Amino acid sequence: MNNAAEITVLGAGSYGTALAISLASNGHKTLLWGHDPKSMQVLAESRSNERFLPGIQFPDCLSIEADLGKALAASKNILVVVPSHVFGDVLKQAKPLLRDDARIVWATKGLEPETGRLLQDVAREQLGEHYPLAVLSGPTFAKELAAGLPTAISVAGTCPQFTHDLVELLHSPKRLRVYANDDFIGIQLGGAVKNVIAIGAGMSDGIGFGANARTALITRGLVELSRLGEAIGADASTFIGMAGLGDLVLTCTDNQSRNRRFGLALGQGKDVITAQEEIGQVVEGYRNTKEVFTLAKRLGVEMPITEQIYQVLYQGKAPVEAAKELLSRDKKSETLKK
């Protein structure tokens, strides 16, 4: 049994493992939990996650645990890195096992399925008001993060001390710069919307529209993110930071992004099911599109790019037709509110 850790990471996929490696590489005792005991045994024996991060060895400070109770007992700092559609279920499982002094941070990017609620609302529903909450987000492809290549992220939360402690835990002079941010809502929203726009950027490139169209789509996607953020009380300046523009540009322009590759396949004429199967991992943007569209409709926020992507994914519209509709929209002023 692991008696103590500075932080426990829930979720042994590519991103959860990469964050655990980064934390342990800083010299912090880190525990990584996954739901499948057999898979976790393989990780423990090989000291690597060959399925998602081949060739990258675990630091000595990284321990593996398949028992959720033991994993949660090991640390007061709990980092949740699971797909958004199981986020609530994982917290529900965790609730009776949490330490009284537990503090919850997540790197999950998305909103609640069907409702479009922010994950902070899901967390409060499952955990109550007792535990401090935080979120981290930014341009972080798992393979590059695990390999020690430099990047930067933002962290925001409900408790200033917890945010400060997370900055200290995560920051590494050689591999990861961490910015504190007081916009808890904006940091969460950026991670969901960028996945949607990345699918659109991939579709644009898959059709063959070129760099000009991709850049225009990214720019107007940022407008949509800012528009939605303003409607739910986010700070507009957040969206020109790491969790907004930073993550958006990364996800829209590099083929390490599953969302972008998914969009590429759609733009090349493949159907949704085939495109998802080709990726072989969770494409968060597929669900995020429905979630973001649901939230925008509920708030009456105009998001034409998101709406067209939704119609491609859920109503069978051809990507070329979606592009035509976007280009033929009424002429208007280029401002965030128009």
Swiss-Prot record:
Protein's pathway: Membrane lipid metabolism; glycerophospholipid metabolism
Pfam families: NAD_Gly3P_dh_C, NAD_Gly3P_dh_N
GO MF, any single term: glycerol-3-phosphate dehydrogenase [NAD(P)+] activity
Subcellular location: Cytoplasm
Reactions it catalyzes: sn-glycerol 3-phosphate + NAD(+) = dihydroxyacetone phosphate + NADH + H(+); sn-glycerol 3-phosphate + NADP(+) = dihydroxyacetone phosphate + NADPH + H(+)
Enzyme class: oxidoreductase
Keyword Electron transport tagged: no
Biological process terms in GO annotation: carbohydrate metabolic process; glycerol-3-phosphate biosynthetic process; glycerol-3-phosphate catabolic process; glycerophospholipid biosynthetic process
Residues reported in the UniProt entry to bind sn-glycerol 3-phosphate: K109, G138, T140, K194, D247, S257, R258, N259
Lineage top rank: taxon: Bacteria
Disulfide cross-links: none
Principal subcellular localisation of the protein: cytoplasm
InterPro entries: 6-PGluconate_DH-like_C_sf, 6PGD_dom2, G3P_DH_NAD-dep, G3P_DH_NAD-dep_C, G3P_DH_NAD-dep_N, NAD(P)-bd_dom_sf
Alphabetized PROSITE patterns for the sequence: NAD_G3PDH
EC numbers: 1.1.1.94
Active site: K194
GO CC term (a single one): cytosol
Keyword terms of this UniProt record: Cytoplasm, Lipid biosynthesis, Lipid metabolism, NAD, NADP, Nucleotide-binding, Oxidoreductase, Phospholipid biosynthesis, Phospholipid metabolism
Role: Catalyzes the reduction of the glycolytic intermediate dihydroxyacetone phosphate (DHAP) to sn-glycerol 3-phosphate (G3P), the key precursor for phospholipid synthesis.
Protein name (database record): Glycerol-3-phosphate dehydrogenase [NAD(P)+]
Organism: Shewanella frigidimarina (strain NCIMB 400)
Classification lineage: Bacteria, Pseudomonadati, Pseudomonadota, Gammaproteobacteria, Alteromonadales
